[in-house]
Swiss-Prot record:
Cu(2+) 3 binds at H76, G77, G78. SUPFAM superfamilies: Prion-like (SSF54098). Cu(2+) 4 binds at H84, G85, G86. This is Major prion protein. Cu(2+) 2 binds at H68, G69, G70. Cu(2+) 1 binds at H60, G61, G62. It comes from Sapajus apella (Brown-capped capuchin). One of its GO terms (cellular component) is side of membrane.
Length: 252
């Protein structure tokens, strides 16, 4: 809190100094006038610039022979043959314009990425789908199973289903629930595609998913702790009072 108070004091002094400088800034203008560098009236010896920004023979800022700022032969600022500023062959509307940009299409990769970053999965009672992970390298104690795992690891899940960590009393309960729901969902989804799992597959999936669920628990616990720390910090009365005072100075 001492370091926080020092930083808040520095922020207060910087804000107060900036407000003082804003009040002392001179008004914009030209040299020794306080106004425009090329005034439209009152210039000694006449004004070399037209008062309304037009060229030769332009009463209202348009091109040659333009009464109101349009192109050649344009009465009101449109393109050639346009009476009121529209596109080619248009009377001022914005429909059917040439080279009109099309609306960007939503990429399926973006949709999949959003669903894989902890989104709630519908139909699973509040379970969320974690982000994709690299399958861990696990040794099962014999050469056959180690080789079998290396050859079939791509068939096993690389994402886990889980509930928020604040709904569990400890890590073991979180991991147990995470393993069960993940294997169940992966088995059902894969079986409907015509692929079956042997007992060896299930055994290996349990080991793989368990490691992934432990990793997911550590990530979620860290994020939950950081959110809680931020809430405690900004809910303390001194910090709230100081922030309110700074907002009052800036807005006022």
């Amino acid at each position: 809190m001492a370091n926080l108070g020092c930083w808040m004091l520095v922020l207060f002094v910087a804000t107060w100094s900036d407000l003082g400088l804003c009040k002392k800034r001179p008004k914009p203008g030209g040299w020794n006038t306080g106004g425009s560098r090329y005034p439209g009236q009152g210039s000694p010896g006449g004004n070399l610039y037209p008062p309304q920004g037009g060229g030769w023979g332009q009463p209202h800022g348009g091109g040659w022979g333009q009464p109101h700022g349009g192109g050649w032969g344009q009465p009101h600022g449109g393109s050639w043959g346009q009476p009121h500023g529209g596109g080619w062959g248009q009377g001022g509307g914005t429909h059917n314009q040439w080279n009109k940009p099309s609306k960007p299409k939503t990429s399926m990769k973006h949709v999949a990425g959003a669903a894989a970053a902890g989104a709630v999965v519908g139909g699973l009672g509040g379970y969320m789908l974690g982000s994709a992970m690299s399958r861990p390298l696990i040794h099962f104690g014999n050469d056959y199973e180690d080789r079998y795992y290396r050859e079939n690891m791509y068939r096993y899940p690389n994402q886990v289903y889980y509930r928020p960590v604040d709904q569990y009393s400890n890590q073991n309960n979180f991991v147990h629930d995470c393993v069960n729901i993940t294997i169940k969902q992966h088995t059902v989804t894969t079986t409907t595609k015509g692929e079956n799992f042997t007992e060896t597959d299930v055994k290996m999936m349990e080991r793989v998913v368990e490691q992934m669920c432990i990793t997911q628990y550590e990530r979620e616990s860290q994020a939950y702790y950081q959110r809680g720390s931020s809430m405690v910090l900004f809910s303390s009365p001194p910090v709230i009072l100081l922030i309110s005072f700074l907002i009052f100075l800036i807005v006022g």
